[in-house]
Each structure stands twice: as C-alpha cells, then as structure tokens.
C-alpha cells in the first residue's frame, strides 16, 4: 500500500506541466502525527491558471482522507520557497524537464 503522499504524487505525475513534486512540513521532517495534513509543493512553471486549477482539482480528488495543502512553488513567497528547499523531500521529478525560458 502506498503512503498518502505518494498517492498524491502519482496524481500529479499525470500532468506534463508538473516538473517536480516536493513533500514539506511535518511529514518531510518525520515528526507528523497520524492525521497530519500533507504539505505538497509543485513546480510547474509552464502551467497557466486553468491548468493549475485542473491540478488542484486532481489533488482534491486524490483517494486519501487527509487534508492536502498544495503550494505552487513558482508563485510561493520567498520565505516559503526557502523552507521547502531546506526541509523538502522530492517525491517526483520529471526525467525531461523543460528548458528554462
């Protein structure tokens, strides 16, 4: 059986715009309680607002009973991006990442 965070990562892999999925917060640190929410950062710089909405909807429909906090990494505040880079654990990274624009 997959962990709840891997279930979410699997949902996100279906979107070609998703370049990286990063777990952060208490689950990444290893100090989460049984019912702790899942904090997920998504790197998807090419996704427009409609596609981001599709991504959010897919995560809402993920087969888990836990709350999921989804953050778009490219629009997150700098302090949060720094924290995610420091404590985050990459769950998925697309093999072919799009070139920087």
Locations of the language-model features?
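Short, well-ordered beta-strand segments
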Residues: 39-41
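Catalytic core of pol beta-like nucleotidyltransferases
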Residues: 1-20, 28-34, 43-101
């Amino acid at each position: 059986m997959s962990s709840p965070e891997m279930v979410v990562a699997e949902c996100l892999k279906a979107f070609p715009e998703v370049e990286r999925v990063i777990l952060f917060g208490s689950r990444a640190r290893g100090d989460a309680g049984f019912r702790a929410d899942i904090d997920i950062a998504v790197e998807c710089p090419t996704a427009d607002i409609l596609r981001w909405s599709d991504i959010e909807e897919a995560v809402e429909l993920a087969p888990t009973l836990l709350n999921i906090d989804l953050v778009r990494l490219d629009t997150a505040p700098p302090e949060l991006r720094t924290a995610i880079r420091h404590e985050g654990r990459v769950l998925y990274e697309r093999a072919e990442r799009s070139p920087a624009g």
